[in-house]
């Protein structure tokens, strides 16, 4: 188990280092591509494993690890496909259907080739334990030749899938750009309408304030005029009352002096 863990760890580390170098030189690989690359390197390392290592690796251990890599690659491939489908949008029905069909067919081909590689490696490990010396070299040479062909098929499957997905991803990006370009005039028009409405509301508010100010001034003028008219109307009565009161005061003062 320990040898198996070390071997798998070495494969993953090597694949990660290769991915880092390639990412600097080219572009970042999708996760499903990285998983297939790990699987291919895994197959290669197992086919080149020394006698003492092959004796310690059980088919069940190897099968579980390779099954996990196959499962991860298929799941990551479908996740990548869904991401591209979402970017294509619901309007691109035909393109989405083509993408789904292409990835399903090519993905199944990749899965079958990975399953076959796993079977061949298990077969190699089983035969390697039963022979020794020159016979082991013959088995290794025969199986190694077939595994090299399988690795080439895996590389071809991966490249074909990558090209397809890259083309669809490019179309999805162009589709999004087209949608943005189509929506931009609407956005600008909506912005202009909003600004026009805001300005109209500001103008209407200003006119309303001016109208209210004029009305207030008119009301103040009306009240002032009404007060003046009331004062003018009451003034004779007040003057008459003042005269009468003064007369009464004069009479009272005269009586007091007598």
From Swiss-Prot:
GO molecular-function terms, A-Z: cholesterol transfer activity; heparan sulfate proteoglycan binding; heparin binding; identical protein binding; low-density lipoprotein particle receptor binding; phosphatidylcholine-sterol O-acyltransferase activator activity; phospholipid binding
GO biological process: acylglycerol homeostasis; cholesterol efflux; cholesterol metabolic process; chylomicron remnant clearance; high-density lipoprotein particle assembly; intermediate-density lipoprotein particle clearance; lipoprotein biosynthetic process; negative regulation of amyloid fibril formation
Keyword Transport assigned: yes
InterPro entries recorded: ApoA_E, Apolipoprotein_A1/A4/E
Signal peptide boundaries: 1-19
UniProt family annotation: Belongs to the apolipoprotein A1/A4/E family.
Protein name: Apolipoprotein E
Native source organism of the sequence: Alligator mississippiensis
Gene this chain is encoded by: APOE
């Amino acid at each position: 188990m320990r040898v198996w863990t070390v071997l798998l760890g070495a494969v993953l580390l090597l694949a990660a280092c290769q991915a880092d170098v390639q990412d600097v030189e080219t572009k970042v690989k999708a996760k499903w591509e990285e998983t297939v690359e790990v699987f291919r390197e895994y197959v290669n390392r197992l086919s080149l494993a020394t006698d003492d290592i092959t004796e310690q690796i059980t088919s069940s251990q190897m099968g579980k690890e390779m099954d996990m890599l196959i499962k991860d690659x298929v799941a990551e491939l479908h996740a990548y496909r869904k991401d591209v489908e979402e970017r294509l949008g619901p309007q691109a029905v035909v393109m989405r259907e083509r993408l789904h069909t292409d990835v399903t067919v090519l993905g199944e081909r990749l899965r079958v080739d990975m399953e076959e590689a796993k079977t061949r490696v298990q077969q190699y490990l089983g035969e390697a334990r039963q022979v020794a010396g020159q016979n082991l070299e013959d088995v290794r040479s025969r199986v190694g030749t077939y595994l090299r062909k399988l690795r080439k098929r895996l590389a071809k499957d991966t490249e074909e899938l990558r090209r397809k997905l890259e083309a669809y991803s490019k179309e999805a990006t162009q589709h999004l750009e087209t949608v943005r370009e189509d929506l931009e005039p609407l956005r600008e028009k909506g912005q202009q309408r909003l600004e026009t409405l805001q300005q109209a509301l500001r103008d209407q508010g200003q006119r309303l304030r001016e109208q209210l100010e004029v009305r207030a001034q008119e009301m103040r003028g009306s009240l002032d005029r009404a007060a003046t008219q009331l004062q003018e109307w009451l003034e004779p009565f007040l003057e008459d009352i003042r005269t009468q009161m003064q007369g009464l005061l004069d009479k009272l003062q005269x009586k007091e002096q007598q």
